[in-house]
């Protein structure tokens, strides 16, 4: 089983239009796209919520977010699995987390590391391909 792991994906700032237009191919080199297509699963650490929430949570440091339409590009990653356990997922509070989960569920994207409640947040995720199985846990 081939797995790619990508960290700190933030579909905002200078690349916002490519993500919201679904043009992820403009952001990735040919060689990297080949590697993505060669993997059964591509695990992405989504380093921000996908939300329209405008009020950031009270915290020290920058608050990151991306538009829900960013999923147009992200869903083009084959075998996409999203990790949400990171220091920016709550930058726009609980609403930002819930909005992100809703977008992922609407697109049938498996995720881990956050949830609608504690039970869902603490669940593991089992990925299976043919005779191979791998368990993931992120908190």
Outline where the language-model segments fall:
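Acidic, metal/ion-coordinating pockets
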Residues: 1-139
């Amino acid at each position: 089983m081939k797995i790619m792991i990508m960290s700190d994906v933030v579909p905002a700032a200078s690349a916002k239009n490519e993500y919201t237009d679904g043009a992820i191919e403009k952001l990735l080199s040919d060689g990297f796209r080949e590697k993505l297509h060669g993997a059964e699963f591509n695990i992405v650490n989504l380093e921000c919520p996908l939300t329209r929430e405008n009020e950031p949570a009270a915290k020290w440091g920058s608050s990151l977010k991306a538009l829900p339409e960013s999923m147009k590009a992200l869903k083009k990653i084959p075998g996409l699995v999203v990790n949400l356990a990171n220091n920016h997922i709550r930058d726009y509070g609980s609403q930002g987390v819930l909005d992100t989960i809703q977008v992922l569920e609407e697109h049938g994207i498996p995720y881990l590391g956050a949830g609608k409640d504690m039970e869902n947040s603490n669940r593991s995720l089992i990925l299976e391909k043919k005779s191979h199985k791998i368990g993931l846990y992120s908190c």
